C-alpha cells in the first residue's frame, strides 16, 4: 500500500510540491479545530487496532491534509503518529503532502525517536522533496537538548544518504554541541561536510572549531583552521582572538597566547577587558605572576574601574601563588575604586586557602567577606570541604546549621561533600547517619551520594553494609553505574570474598548496566590477585569481545598477573601485541613489561626497553632500575648491574633495600664478598635497614666460601639489628656447618630452629641427618630420619648413604642392611664407599648372606661403571 501511495503521489507531484523544490506549503485549519480534537481523542484514548480505525472512519469529515497536519502537531507518541499517518494513506489512497511528512518528522524530533527516519526519508526522496529547513533544525536541536549528540549526527548523515541538504544551522548547532563535550574529530567531519555542500563558514564557526581543538591540546589542528580562515578572506574579530588567548594559554602555550595578544592591535582591533583578563589568567596559571601584575596595572591605568572578572582573576593568581597579603590588598583597592568585591572574589581566595590547607585563615576571610557579600552555596561548600578534610567536624556541622538558617541547606551538593569527606577520613558512622537523615522530599541522594558511601564502607571492610546501600540505590530513582559496580567488585575481592565479587559482576550484567574499560580492568586485576589467572585471561578476551580496545593498563594488569602466576615467558608475545595495536606505554606499563622480561630471562630485551623508555621521555623509576639490576645480577652481569646502580644514584633516585640486596646477592654468589660487604655498608650508611633477604644472601655467600666463622658473626649482627631469622637462614647455617664438619654446632642451630616453631625444609632435614650420621651421632640421626619420613618427607640418596654409613660405623649391621635394601627399592644410587663400609660391618657380624648381596651389588656397580668408561 505504501508503494501504491508513493506511485500515485509521483503522478500528482507537480500540483503538490512546486516542481520538487523543498518549500513548505502553509496550511491552516481555523474551522476544523473540532475535527482535529475528535481525531486526537480517538488516537489518545485507546490502543490502535480495527476498533480505532472504525471509529475514525465513522467520524463525519472529509479527509484533508490540514487534518493530518493538525493531528500530527498534537500527538506525543511517534508510533501512534505513524499508525495514523498510514491509516490516512489507506483511507484516501492519496499521497501525503510535504507539510504532512515534515509534521511527522517533527513528532519524531519531539519524541527523540528516529527508528522510522530511514523509511520516511526514503519515501520523501522518491516523492521528490525533503525535510524543510525548520524541520531539519528541530530534529538536530531535539537531540542536542537531550544530550544525544550521536543521534543528532546520525540524523544529518541519514539526510545526506538520501541526497538531502541539511540546514546550515543544523550543522552549526551540532558542531557547537560537540565542542562542549570535546569531540573535535566529529566537529571537523561536520565542518568538512558543510564545505562539500558549498556552505560558507563564518568567523563564529571557525571560532567554535578552534576553541574545541585548542581545548584538547591539538594545537597544530587549531592553527591549521586559523590559517584556513585567513585564506578564506575572513578577518578575525576580537571574540576569536580572546578565544585563542584563553584556549592556547590553558594548554600551556603562553608564548602563543602573547602572540595573539600583540596581533590584536596590529590588525586594527582594540583589546577589551575580556582580552586582558584572559591574558592575566593565562600568565597566572603559568606562574608568570610579575607579567600578570604588570598587565593588570596597565588595565587599571587605562580604565577607571576594571571589570569584576579581572579583579577576581588577579586575586586568584595571588592566592594560587600563596601571596595572600597582595590578594587582600587588591580587595581594598577594589573597594577604594567604588567596586565592592563580589562573592566570587572571596571564593577565589577561599579556594586557594583550601588548596594550602589554611583552615583558620579561611574562617577569618569568611567572617570578613560577610561585610561585602553574602556567602553563597559555593562558599559554604568550600569551607565545609576544608573542615572535613582537617577533621574539624564540629565546626563543619555548625557551618551546615548556618547554611540551613540562610536557606541553603539541605542540598545534595553539600551532603555529597560531607559524606565523601567523612568516608575518606573513615568516619563511616557519621557518614551513614547523614545519609539516613536525608529528607527525600527536600533533598534526595543522587548517584554521587550512593557511590561515595558504598565505596567508603567497602574500603574499610564493611562490604555487607555497602551492599545494603547498593540495594537502596536499586530501589531509588538513581541509576546504578559502572563506578558503583567497580567499587563493590574491588572491595569484595580485597576482603577475601571473591565469590561475592563475581556475583556483583553478574548482577551488573542482569541490570543491563554496561561495564566500562576501567571496571573490566579492575575486575581482571582482582582475579589475578585472587589467584585466578585463567579467569583473568578470560576477562582480557572479554574486554576485546565487548569491543573495547585494551589500553596500557589492561596489558599491564595481564602481564603482571601472568608473571605472578609463573607465566613470565608470555611477556614477550604480549608486549609485541601491545605495540602492534599502537598502545602507548606509560611508566607503569614499561616497568611491568621490563620486570616480565627480566623474570623470563630476556634481560637484554629489558635493557633495550629501559633505553627506549628514556628516549621517549619517560624517566625510569626505582622500580625500573630495580628490575633490570636484579635481572643482570642473577645472570652474573654484575658490572653492568653496578653501572645502572650508579646511574640511578646520579639521578637522585631513592634506592631501596631491595636493589641493594639484589647486588649483595649477585656479588655474593660469584664469591666477590668484599664488594658485597661494601654495598651492605653503603646501605646502612644511607639509613636503610637490611632485610631478611639481604642477610640470607650474605650468609649464603659466606657459607659457600666456607667462611663459617664470619657467617656466625654475621648471624649475630642480624639478630642484634632485630631481624628475625627464618627457616632459610637456619638452613644456610646448618648446611654450612655440616659442610665444614661442625655437625654438633649445626645440631644446636637445628634445635634452636625447632624451638622457634619453624618447620625445617627437606634440604635442612637431609643435611642434618647426613651430618649427624657422619658425626657418629647415630641415635639422633636415626630419630630425625624416622621423624622426617613420618611427616611425609622423602630422603634423598645422600641422606640414605650417610645413614647406612653411620649405622655401619656404629656396628648396627642389620639396621644398615635394611636401609640398604630400602634404598635399592627406591631406585636411588648407592655409593661404592657406602657398600664397602656396610660390607665390612656385615662380615664382622657374620651376616654372610647379607654380605653376599652387598658384594654382588658392589660388583655390578663396578661393571656398570667400567662399561660406561669403555663406551
Swiss-Prot record:
Protein name: Pentatricopeptide repeat-containing protein At3g06920
Key words, A-Z: Repeat
InterPro entries linked to this entry: Pentatricopeptide_rpt (IPR002885), PPR_P_subfamily (IPR050872), TPR-like_helical_dom_sf (IPR011990)
UniProt keyword Repeat present: yes
Pfam families linked: PPR, PPR_1, PPR_2, PPR_3
PPR repeats by residue range: 97-131, 132-166, 167-201, 202-236, 237-271, 272-306, 307-341, 342-372, 376-410, 411-445, 446-480, 481-515, 516-550, 551-585, 586-620, 621-655, 656-690, 691-725, 726-760, 761-795, 796-830
Similarity comment: Belongs to the PPR family. P subfamily.
Native source organism of the sequence: Arabidopsis thaliana
Highest taxon, organism lineage: Eukaryota
Amino acid at each position: 500500500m505504501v508503494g501504491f501511495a508513493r506511485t500515485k503521489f509521483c503522478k500528482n507531484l507537480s500540483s503538490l510540491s512546486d516542481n520538487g523544490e523543498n518549500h513548505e506549503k502553509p496550511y491552516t485549519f481555523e474551522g476544523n479545530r473540532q475535527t482535529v480534537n475528535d481525531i486526537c481523542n480517538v488516537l489518545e484514548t485507546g490502543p490502535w487496532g480495527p476498533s480505532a480505525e472504525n471509529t475514525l472512519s465513522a467520524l463525519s469529515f472529509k479527509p484533508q491534509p490540514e487534518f493530518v497536519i493538525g493531528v500530527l502537531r498534537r500527538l506525543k507518541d511517534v508510533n501512534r503518529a505513524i499508525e495514523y499517518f498510514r491509516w490516512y494513506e489507506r483511507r484516501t489512497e492519496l499521497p501525503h503532502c510535504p507539510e504532512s511528512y515534515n509534521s511527522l518528522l517533527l513528532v519524531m524530533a519531539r519524541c527523540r525517536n528516529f527508528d522510522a527516519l530511514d523509511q520516511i526519508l526514503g519515501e520523501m526522496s522518491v516523492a521528490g522533496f525533503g525535510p524543510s529547513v525548520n524541520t531539519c533544525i528541530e530534529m538536530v536541536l531535539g537531540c542536542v537538548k537531550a544530550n544525544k549528540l550521536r543521534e543528532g549526527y546520525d540524523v544529518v548523515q541519514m539526510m545526506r544518504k538520501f541526497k538531502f541538504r541539511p540546514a546550515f544551522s543544523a550543522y552549526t548547532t551540532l558542531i557547537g554541541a560537540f565542542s562542549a563535550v570535546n569531540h573535535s574529530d566529529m566537529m571537523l567531519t561536520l565542518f568538512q561536510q558543510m564545505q562539500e555542500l558549498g556552505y560558507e563558514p563564518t568567523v563564529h564557526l571557525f571560532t567554535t572549531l578552534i576553541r574545541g581543538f585548542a581545548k584538547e591540546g591539538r594545537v597544530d589542528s587549531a592553527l591549521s583552521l586559523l590559517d584556513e580562515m585567513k585564506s578564506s578572506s575572513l578577518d578575525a574579530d576580537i571574540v576569536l582572538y580572546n578565544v585563542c588567548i584563553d584556549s592556547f594559554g590553558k594548554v600551556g602555550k603562553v608564548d602563543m597566547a602573547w602572540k595573539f595578544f600583540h596581533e590584536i592591535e596590529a590588525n586594527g582591533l582594540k583589546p577589551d577587558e575580556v582580552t586582558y583578563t584572559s591574558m592575566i589568567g593565562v600568565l597566572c596559571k603559568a606562574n608568570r605572576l610579575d607579567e600578570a601584575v604588570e598587565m593588570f596595572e596597565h588595565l587599571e591605568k587605562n580604565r577607571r574601574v576594571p571589570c569584576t572578572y579581572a579583579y577576581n582573576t588577579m586575586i586568584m593568581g595571588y592566592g594560587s601563588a600563596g601571596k595572600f597579603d597582595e590578594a587582600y590588598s587588591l580587595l581594598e583597592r577594589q573597594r577604594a575604586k567604588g567596586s565592592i568585591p563580589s562573592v566570587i572574589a572571596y571564593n577565589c581566595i577561599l579556594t586557594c586557602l583550601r588548596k594550602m590547607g589554611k583552615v583558620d585563615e579561611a574562617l577569618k576571610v569568611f567572617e570578613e567577606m560577610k561585610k561585602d557579600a553574602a556567602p553563597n552555596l559555593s562558599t559554604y561548600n568550600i569551607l565545609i570541604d576544608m573542615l572535613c578534610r582537617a577533621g574539624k567536624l564540629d565546626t563543619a556541622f555548625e557551618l551546615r546549621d548556618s547554611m540551613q538558617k540562610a536557606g541553603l541547606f539541605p542540598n545534595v551538593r553539600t551532603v555529597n561533600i560531607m559524606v565523601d569527606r567523612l568516608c575518606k577520613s573513615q568516619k563511616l558512622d557519621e557518614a551513614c547517619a547523614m545519609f539516613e537523615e536525608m529528607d527525600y522530599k527536600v533533598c534526595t541522594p543522587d548517584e554521587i551520594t550512593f557511590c561515595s558511601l558504598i565505596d567508603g564502607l567497602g574500603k574499610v571492610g564493611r562490604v555487607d553494609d555497602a551492599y545494603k546501600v547498593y540495594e537502596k540505590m536499586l530501589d531509588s530513582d538513581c541509576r546504578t553505574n559502572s563506578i558503583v559496580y567497580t567499587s563493590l567488585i574491588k572491595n569484595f575481592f580485597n576482603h577475601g570474598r571473591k565469590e561475592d565479587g563475581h556475583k556483583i559482576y553478574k548482577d551488573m550484567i542482569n541490570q543491563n548496566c554496561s561495564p566500562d574499560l576501567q571496571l573490566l580492568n579492575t575486575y581482571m586485576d582482582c582475579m589475578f590477585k585472587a589467584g585466578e589467572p585463567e579467569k583473568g585471561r578470560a576477562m582480557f578476551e572479554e574486554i576485546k569481545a565487548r569491543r573495547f580496545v585494551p589500553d596500557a593498563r589492561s596489558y599491564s594488569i595481564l602481564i603482571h598477573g601472568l608473571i605472578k602466576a609463573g607465566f613470565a615467558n608470555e611477556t614477550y608475545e604480549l608486549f609485541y601485541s601491545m605495540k602492534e595495536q599502537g598502545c602507548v606505554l606509560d611508566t607503569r606499563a614499561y616497568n611491568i613489561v621490563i620486570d616480565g622480561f627480566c623474570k623470563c630471562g630476556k634481560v637484554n630485551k629489558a635493557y633495550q626497553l629501559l633505553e627506549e623508555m628514556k628516549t621517549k621521555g619517560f624517566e625510569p623509576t626505582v622500580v625500573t632500575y630495580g628490575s633490570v639490576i636484579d635481572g643482570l645480577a642473577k645472570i652474573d652481569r654484575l658490572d653492568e648491574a653496578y653501572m645502572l646502580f650508579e646511574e640511578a644514584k646520579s639521578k637522585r633516585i631513592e634506592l631501596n633495600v631491595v636493589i641493594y640486596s639484589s647486588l649483595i646477592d649477585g656479588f655474593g654468589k660469584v664469591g666477590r664478598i668484599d664488594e658485597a660487604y661494601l654495598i651492605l655498608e653503603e646501605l646502612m650508611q644511607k639509613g636503610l635497614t637490611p632485610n631478611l633477604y639481604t642477610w640470607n644472601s650474605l650468609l649464603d655467600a659466606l657459607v659457600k666460601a666456607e667462611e663459617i666463622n664470619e657467617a656466625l658473626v654475621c648471624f649475630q649482627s642480624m639478630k642484634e639489628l632485630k631481624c628475625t631469622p627464618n627457616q632459610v637462614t637456619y638452613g644456610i647455617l646448618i648446611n654450612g656447618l655440616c659442610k665444614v664438619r661442625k655437625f654438633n654446632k649445626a645440631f644446636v642451630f637445628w634445635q634452636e630452629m625447632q624451638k622457634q616453631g619453624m618447620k625445617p625444609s627437606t634440604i635442612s632435614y637431609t643435611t642434618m641427618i647426613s651430618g649427624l650420621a657422619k658425626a657418629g651421632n647415630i641415635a639422633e640421626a636415626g630419630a630425625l630420619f624416622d621423624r622426617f619420613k613420618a611427616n611425609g618427607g622423602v630422603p634423598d640418596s645422600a641422606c640414605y648413604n650417610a645413614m647406612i654409613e653411620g649405622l655401619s660405623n656404629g656396628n648396627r649391621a642389620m639396621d644398615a642392611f635394611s636401609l640398604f635394601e630400602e634404598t635399592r627399592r627406591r631406585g636411588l644410587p648407592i655409593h661404592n664407599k657406602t657398600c664397602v663400609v656396610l660390607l665390612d660391618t656385615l662380615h664382622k657380624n657374620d651376616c654372610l648372606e647379607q654380605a653376599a648381596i652387598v658384594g654382588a651389588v658392589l660388583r655390578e656397580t663396578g661393571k656398570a661403571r667400567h662399561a660406561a668408561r669403555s663406551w
